[in-house]
Amino acid sequence: MKSCCVTDVGQKRMMNQDFVYASEEPVGNLPNLFVVADGMGGHRAGDFASRYTVEIIQKSIRANRERNPIKIIRMAIETANMKVLEKANSDENLAGMGTTVVVATVVENYIYVANVGDSRLYLIRDEIQQITRDHSLVEEMVRMGEINREQARNHPDKNIITRAVGVRSRVSIDFFDMKLEKDDTVLMCSDGLSNMLEDEEIQEIIR
């Protein structure tokens, strides 16, 4: 397995509120760990939320003696949610902050994934497939048949998310797992990438 990380502020913002962590080496009882977080809540607060969330997730996993990868990741995200919310409630400069997060680990030939918000994990095999499901207003509108995918890409509310870490006392997390095959490529990203490029464009670049 080989991994690499790239993050860029882009052309629309002065500060990059994304934070990424990647370790091909063991982290606690996980054989590897990959995390992408995209903060929100103003420049300082959003940057802090994503960085702090990734930091807490790492610390929680290192201290956890559990063996089940899904349980390990769940507890780490729940701990991060509690810690971020505490910070937001105790510092007026951080009030209202939160972050998306997508977490993955590969155990033998299986990948275990968790996500909150609209940061994504893709599997690129013969075709590109979005594994995670966005927790966003436009995704709900698509599922309800109110708009189609093309309308969702250009919708004025496309950046409104319905779940985030550090916003409420309890966080709802989606989990996925699947068997990987030789030459599979896994891509984790924030909406900074998925809002700019169609899935097929991403696939062409990765290839």
Predicted regions and their residues:
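PP2C/PPM-type serine/threonine phosphatase catalytic domain
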Residues: M1-R207
